[in-house]
UniProtKB/Swiss-Prot annotation:
Motif extent (Twin CX3C motif): 45-68
UniProt protein name: Mitochondrial import inner membrane translocase subunit TIM13
GO molecular function, one term: copper ion binding
Disulfide linkage: 45-68, 49-64
Chief site of localization: mitochondrion
Function: Mitochondrial intermembrane chaperone that participates in the import and insertion of some multi-pass transmembrane proteins into the mitochondrial inner membrane. Also required for the transfer of beta-barrel precursors from the TOM complex to the sorting and assembly machinery (SAM complex) of the outer membrane. Acts as a chaperone-like protein that protects the hydrophobic precursors from aggregation and guide them through the mitochondrial intermembrane space.
Protein family per UniProt: Belongs to the small Tim family.
Keyword Disulfide bond: yes
Organism: Arabidopsis thaliana (Mouse-ear cress)
Recorded superkingdom: Eukaryota
Length: 87
């Protein structure tokens, strides 16, 4: 049985308040977003900047990754602000 169809609170029959349920959903969404962000940064920045993986990053690779992550985060912030101000 998956987590969406399992009874709340371990199947004891007690109900979960809407507030507790909402906090749980928010936490799960935040975790999923963080995992997706890390994967996106890996594919967009690491794969772009590190052409020959080794035991450590070179100076140019490190600065390339830093710039890439910075640009991606800035673009994400601009898009988020734009979406939330349109509502």
């Amino acid at each position: 049985m998956d987590s969406y169809s399992s009874p709340p609170m371990g199947g004891s029959g007690s109900s979960v308040s809407p507030e507790v349920m909402m906090e749980s959903v928010k936490t799960q969404l935040a975790q999923a977003y963080a995992e997706e962000l890390i994967e996106t940064l890996r594919t967009k920045c690491f794969d772009k900047c590190v052409t020959k993986p080794g035991s450590s990053l070179g100076g140019s690779e490190s600065s390339c990754i830093s710039r890439c992550v910075e640009r991606y985060m800035e673009a994400t912030a601009i898009i988020s602000r734009s979406l939330f101000t349109q509502r």
